[in-house]
Amino acid sequence: MTEFGIRNMDQVAPVYNGHRGMLKRQLAFDNVQVPTSLYCGLFSAYEEEQAVPTGLDSYPHDSSSCELPLLTPCSKAVMSQALKDTFNGFAKERCRLGIPGNPWLWDENNVLQWLLWAAKEFSLENVNFQKFLMNGHELCSLGKERFLALAPDFVGDILWEHLEEMMKEYQEKAQEPYIDHSNRDSLNQWMNADSLNFTADPLQCGAQVHNYPKNGMYNDMCSVPTGQTLLNPKQEFQQYPSSCLKSRAVNYPPASQDFARSHMNVLLNSLNSGKLRDYDSGDSGTESFESTESLLHSWTSQSSLVDMQRVPSYDSFEEDGNQTLCLNKQPMSFKDYIQDRCEPAELGKPVIPASILAGFTGSGPIQLWQFLLELLTDKSCQSFISWTGDGWEFKLADPDEVARRWGKRKNKPKMNYEKLSRGLRYYYDKNIIHKTSGKRYVYRFVCDLHNLLGYTPDELHAMLGVQPDTDE
């Protein structure tokens, strides 16, 4: 017995010594030809497997067998749906800004608003807005090739697809021109049509946009007859050059085209230089209450006295913005405007609807002061907001309810009184609304509501059955 416990060595399988000559390692050494190159045979045997890949060699040269995913109908549908979802964002913005849904009816302001939305949506930089200084009819008439030549790189096809989709949509619907009383009615609804040399049906609530003169969107601005001068003209927009303001005294329409172009250039220059505020504001601060696009709306709301001169919008006028720009003629009051529209106040409805007031003043989206007037002239709201009986003074009996309704109107469910009060405080410096000292939640309109609305405080109080507030 051996030390390994094997009794009979014959039981151990014989070791085969022939396999050593078949080892790959031995084969490599057998191929050595130069003694100093020990591994040359090994490299020679595996040189094809040891080649360093370039990254391109892993792909077949035959394009038919390419492993990269091709653009299939399914992937095209996904991309198309993604673009449609993006375009739906502009549909919401269009409704908020009062832009006609039919791009053929856009004015120069609407075209610019669309481009601003696109620049923000697609993070475009160095967009030359001056290339698109045209109205909707001119824009849609460009055709794809000319449009792509003007559009920013890489997104021209997407923008044209969006524009073409909007054009096809309204060609299929063949509906009447877009009218949105909740934002901005046509200015010639309430101006004297004869003074601008075009006619409007008095029974028609809104005139069609394409009935305007073709020489620009600014021909509906204030018309000053020959011989009349402006008294103490104050710039209603801080970027107005004083020399341009004086041009209001010339006769229109001959000079209106140059006036519009020069002022639009000022706006476009500010856009291209990055001086304009962010296109779309967040929920914080006074941006929650007033339209940040008032910079653009101010260009379409210069028509006459009742045009936000007395009650300025978010940032369109200076502190004395309640001075008139056209003192040569007696302005139409809101009361007369309602009568001309053949829309008398209905029972159970506000005497001063905010949507109609916004269209009357040309302020664009409904503003906070307009919304408060609507609530104050609605008998059903007297439990949470009402006149005190002392002139234009009013009280928020339930400020949270007022804030909730304002948030519902502006589609901001997180609105509360703290945020709403920021909008009210903004009005302090603009001499629109002041806080009544010593009284909680009591405010007063200090602007010229009498001439704007055509009602005295006593008339409104009598219509609403308001009794003097004896609470301190």
Swiss-Prot record:
The entry's DNA-binding region: 366-446
Gene Ontology BP, a term: regulation of transcription by RNA polymerase II
UniProt GO MF annotations: DNA-binding transcription factor activity, RNA polymerase II-specific; sequence-specific DNA binding
Record-linked CDD domains: SAM_PNT-ETS-2 (cd08543)
Ranges that cross the membrane: none
InterPro entries for this protein: Ets1_N_flank, Ets_dom, ETS_fam, Pointed_dom, SAM/pointed_sf, Transform_prot_C-ets, Transform_prot_C-ets-2, WH-like_DNA-bd_sf
Residue intervals of the PNT domain: 85-170
Pfam families referenced in this protein's UniProt entry, alphabetically: Ets, Ets1_N_flank, SAM_PNT
Keyword presence, Cell division: no
Keyword terms of this UniProt record: DNA-binding, Nucleus, Transcription, Transcription regulation
Compartments in which it is found: Nucleus
Superkingdom: Eukaryota
GO CC terms: nucleus
Keyword hit for Transcription regulation: yes
Cited function: Probable transcription factor.
Family (UniProt): Belongs to the ETS family.
This protein's name: Protein c-ets-2-B
Source organism (scientific name): Xenopus laevis
